[in-house]
Curated annotation (Swiss-Prot):
Species, as recorded: Pectobacterium carotovorum subsp. carotovorum (strain PC1)
Protein's UniProt name: UDP-N-acetylglucosamine--N-acetylmuramyl-(pentapeptide) pyrophosphoryl-undecaprenol N-acetylglucosamine transferase
Taxonomic lineage: Bacteria, Pseudomonadati, Pseudomonadota, Gammaproteobacteria, Enterobacterales
UniProt membrane topology term: Peripheral membrane protein
Source domain of life: Bacteria
Record keywords: Cell cycle, Cell division, Cell inner membrane, Cell membrane, Cell shape, Cell wall biogenesis/degradation, Glycosyltransferase, Membrane, Peptidoglycan synthesis, Transferase
Gene from which the chain derives: murG
Binding site for UDP-N-acetyl-alpha-D-glucosamine: T15, G16, G17, N127, R163, S191, I244, A263, L264, T265, V266, S267, E268, Q288
C-alpha cells in the first residue's frame, strides 16, 4: 500500500525500549513513501540515534517527575505547558497526518499538542503494564495498541516491533535439532550490565561445570571484574564480553538465555524462539515481571525474582532443562511471538491517517 505524500510524526524517547520499535515502524512506512519526522528531547539517546537512521528530529524540553524534589513538582505545570506549546508549534509547522506515540516523557506534551491540533494519535505500549504517560494519553488517543495483553483492558494486542535480523533466524526445530555437548547459555545484562547477573553467574558456572558453556555480556566497565570472578572459581573457558554488537548472531548461538525482562528483550526472545530464565528488574510497578509472565505461562520461560536469584536456584533450574525440554520451550516461545508486529502497528497508523483525510475532506 502506498503512503505517498503522507506524513508521520513519531514521539518516542529516553530508552531503547521506546526508540527502537518506533524506528522499525518509521522505516517500514518510509519504504511505502511516507515522510517521517521525530519528536524527542535533546539530552536523551534519540538525539544521536534517530538522525543516524536518516530521520529528522525536533526537540522539546521535558523530563520525568517521578522521584523529583518539591520545587520540580511545583513548577511541573508550567514546564508541561511550555512543552505542549513547543510541540504544538512543531506540529503546526510539519502538519503530520498522524502521530505515533511510543512512550517516554516526550509523548505526553506531544500527544496533547497533536490532539489540540486535531491530529489523530496512535499509542503503542511496549510493556505488560502501562506507563504513566500512555495511561493518561489513552483517553485522547484515536487508537491504543499494546504489545502484551493486560496493559489496557480493550486495546488490540499487536506485539513489539522487532529487528528484522532477529525475525529472520531459523525456527527452533531447524536451529536446535542436531545440537549436542554442553548447553549454550547466553547471559545478557544490557548496555549497563546487570549486577545480579555478573555476581551470580560465575558461581553457577562453577556449580554446573562441563554441562554448560557460557557467553556472558557484562555491560560497560565490568569486563575485568567479571573475568576475574570466573577465573577465581576455575572457569576460564567461557566467553566474557562487554557488549554484543550482533544480537541475532548471539541468539542463533544460544540454547537458553538468562537476562532481565525488558519489553523488547522479551519480544526478541519470543521471536527468536528461545527458552529463557528471567530475573525482572525490581521496579515499583513490577513492569518487567508482567512482561515475562506470558512466556512463563506458555511454558517457554521461568521467572526468578531478584531476591531469590542465587547460585543454587539458578543452577537447579538450568540443570533441570535437558535438550528435549529446551527444544519444546523454544517452540512454545516462538508460538507466543507476534512476528508481524511492525506491519500491524504500521497498518493502524495508516488507518488513522486515512480516517483523518476522510474527516478533513468531509469537514
Amino acid at each position: 500500500m502506498s503512503g505517498e505524500g503522507k506524513r508521520l510524526m513519531v514521539m518516542a524517547g529516553g530508552t531503547g525500549g521506546h526508540v527502537f520499535p518506533g524506528l522499525a515502524v518509521a522505516h517500514h512506512l518510509m519504504a511505502q513513501g511516507w515522510q517521517v519526522r521525530w519528536l524527542g528531547t535533546a539530552d536523551r539517546m534519540e538525539a544521536d540515534l534517530v538522525p543516524k537512521h536518516g530521520i529528522e528530529i525536533d526537540f522539546i524540553r521535558i523530563s520525568g517527575l517521578r522521584g523529583k524534589g518539591i520545587w520540580a513538582q511545583l513548577s511541573a505545570p508550567i514546564r508541561i505547558f511550555q512543552a505542549v506549546r513547543q510541540a504544538r508549534a512543531i506540529m503546526r509547522r510539519y502538519q503530520p497526518d498522524v502521530v505515533l506515540g511510543m512512550g517516554g516523557y516526550v509523548s505526553g506534551p506531544g500527544g496533547l499538542a497533536a490532539w489540540l491540533c486535531g491530529i489523530p494519535v496512535v499509542l503503542h505500549e511496549q510493556n505488560g503494564i502501562a506507563g504513566l504517560t500512555n495511561r493518561w494519553l489513552s483517553h485522547i488517543a484515536k487508537k491504543v495498541l499494546q504489545a502484551f495483553p493486560g496493559a489496557f483492558p480493550k486495546a488490540d494486542v499487536v506485539g513489539n516491533p522487532v529487528r528484522t535480523d532477529v525475525l529472520a533466524l531459523p525456527v527452533p526445530e531447524t536451529r536446535l535439532a542436531d545440537r549436542s555437548g554442553p548447553v549454550r547459555v547466553l547471559v545478557v545484562g544490557g548496555s549497563q550490565g546487570a549486577r545480579v547477573l555478573n555476581q551470580t553467574l560465575p558461581g553457577v558456572a562453577a556449580q554446573l561445570g562441563e554441562r554448560v558453556t557460557i557467553w556472558h555480556q557484562v555491560g560497560k566497565g565490568a569486563l575485568s571484574t567479571v573475568q576475574q570472578a570466573y577465573q577465581d572459581v576455575g572457569q576460564t573457558q567461557h566467553k566474557i564480553t562487554e557488549f554484543i554488537d550482533d544480537m541475532a548472531a548471539a541468539y542463533a548461538w544460544a540454547d537458553v538465555v538468562v537476562c532481565r525482562s525488558g519489553a523488547l528483550t522479551v519480544s526478541e526472545i519470543a521471536a527468536a524462539g528461545l527458552p529463557a530464565l528471567f530475573v525482572p528488574f525490581q521496579h515499583k510497578d513490577r513492569q518487567q515481571y508482567w512482561n515475562a509472565l506470558p512466556l512463563e505461562k506458555a511454558g517457554a520461560a521461568k521467572i526468578i525474582e531478584q531476591p531469590q536469584f542465587n547460585v543454587a536456584a539458578v543452577s537447579e533450574v538450568l540443570s533441570g532443562w535437558d535438550r528435549a525440554t529446551l527444544l519444546t520451550m523454544a517452540q512454545k516461545a516462538r508460538a507466543v511471538a507476534i512476528p508481524d508486529a511492525t506491519d500491524r502497528v504500521a497498518a493502524e497508523v495508516s488507518a488513522a491517517a486515512g480516517s483523518r483525510a476522510t474527516h478533513v475532506a468531509h469537514g
